[in-house]
From Swiss-Prot:
The keyword Protein biosynthesis does not apply. This is Alcohol dehydrogenase 1. Changing W93A: Has an inverted specificity pattern for primary alcohols, being 3- and 10-fold more active on hexanol and 350- and 540-fold less active on ethanol. Also acquires weak activity on branched chain alcohols and cyclohexanol. The lineage of its organism: Eukaryota, Fungi, Dikarya, Ascomycota, Saccharomycotina. InterPro entries: ADH-like_C, ADH-like_N, ADH_Zn_CS, GroES-like_sf, NAD(P)-bd_dom_sf, PKS_ER. It comes from Saccharomyces cerevisiae (strain ATCC 204508 / S288c) (Baker's yeast).
Length: 348
């Protein structure tokens, strides 16, 4: 298979610097890596943080962002096993880990101190060819719609793992804060498929319509409802059994600690820059509330999340645009105007 020397990609050279759509070199895979011809990539709010450089974790510069890449294996290093040319493969946030530390041995690879992160410490999927550690790359079934599956590789895996972390049972109420965004819209569908009743919180044009179209039961528009806590308590007859916080709002996180049910769990997923998690200690102790963080997912979570997708239980509400339009997508993200998930076609 002929592999070009150069390719189109979006790169920036300094934090919040110009996003340049230009010709860049095609990377060479290391001994343990795949070279993937990326066809489509989802665009995640984390990509915006990587560009802004506003998280406490240092970003590689210059950087090609992106960590929801779906494509075809076109090359591999000499030590790679279990893959062949032509396989469908996914590039995840966790590009690689050491597989030898205590975290990796327990299946918590995302907590590996040597983790390599796509679109953050490792050039990601906003280019036509990208590399990924063969152990962590996602196996995608042949014939899968690569545009549709791209958001599952981060957003889907992340919310699926978060729902597992909430320790819910069928029939329980789960509140999803940020329910109509890229992560939230998938969380609604995974929650429904897992047998939960879904309450969504979001605000803005078209968001309630999207929420209801994917099976959500109760929607609360924070731009219209002044008492979010009271509204959730009333709708769920005492509070949500679990909360999945995917919004990037510190106030939303604090509110979730007040509308979660006694003995319930609020799961933190979204990471607003510089935000703190504030919970009234008396309320937390007396109600026996758990507050936990959930950070992407491991290889088993990946396999399970992709299985839900393959069986038609979840579908990404996507809008496909050209990779060259990435700066415009970031602008929409900064203004909170994203409904569903944008996916970029690397050929445009």
């Amino acid at each position: 298979m002929s592999i070009p020397e150069t390719q189109k990609g979006v790169i920036f050279y300094e934090s919040h610097g110009k996003l340049e759509y230009k010709d860049i070199p095609v990377p060479k895979p290391k001994a343990n890596e795949l070279l993937i011809n990326v066809k489509y990539s989802g665009v995640c709010h984390t990509d915006l943080h990587a560009w802004h450089g506003d998280w406490p974790l240092p970003v590689k510069l210059p950087l090609v962002g992106g960590h929801e890449g779906a494509g075809v294996v076109v090359g591999m290093g000499e030590n790679v096993k279990g893959w062949k040319i032509g396989d469908y493969a996914g590039i995840k946030w966790l590009n690689g880990s050491c597989m030898a530390c205590e975290y990796c041995e327990l299946g918590n690879e995302s907590n590996c101190p040597h983790a390599d992160l796509s679109g953050y410490t490792h050039d990601g999927s906003f280019q036509q060819y990208a590399t990924a550690d063969a152990v962590q790359a996602a196996h995608i079934p042949q014939g899968t719609d690569l545009a549709q599956v791209a958001p599952i590789l981060c957003a889907g895996i992340t919310v699926y793992k978060a729902l597992k972390s909430a320790n819910l049972m069928a029939g329980h109420w789960v509140a999803i804060s940020g329910a109509a965004g890229g992560l939230g819209s998938l969380a609604v569908q995974y929650a429904k498929a897992m047998g939960y009743r879904v309450l969504g919180i979001d605000g803005g044009e078209g968001k309630e319509e999207l929420f209801r179209s994917i099976g959500g039961e109760v929607f609360i528009d924070f731009t219209k409802e002044k008492d979010i806590v009271g509204a959730v308590l009333k709708a769920t007859d005492g509070g949500a059994h679990g909360v999945i916080n995917v919004s990037v709002s510190e106030a939303a996180i604090e509110a979730s600690t007040r509308y979660v049910r006694a003995n319930g769990t609020t799961v933190l997923v979204g990471m607003p820059a510089g935000a703190k998690c504030c919970s009234d200690v008396f309320n937390q102790v007396v109600k026996s509330i758990s507050i936990v963080g959930s950070y992407v997912g491991n290889r088993a979570d990946t396999r399970e999340a992709l299985d839900f997708f393959a069986r038609g239980l979840v579908k990404s509400p996507i809008k496909v645009v050209g990779l060259s339009t990435l700066p415009e997508i970031y602008e929409k993200m900064e203004k909170g105007q994203i409904v569903g998930r944008y996916v970029v076609d690397t050929s445009k």
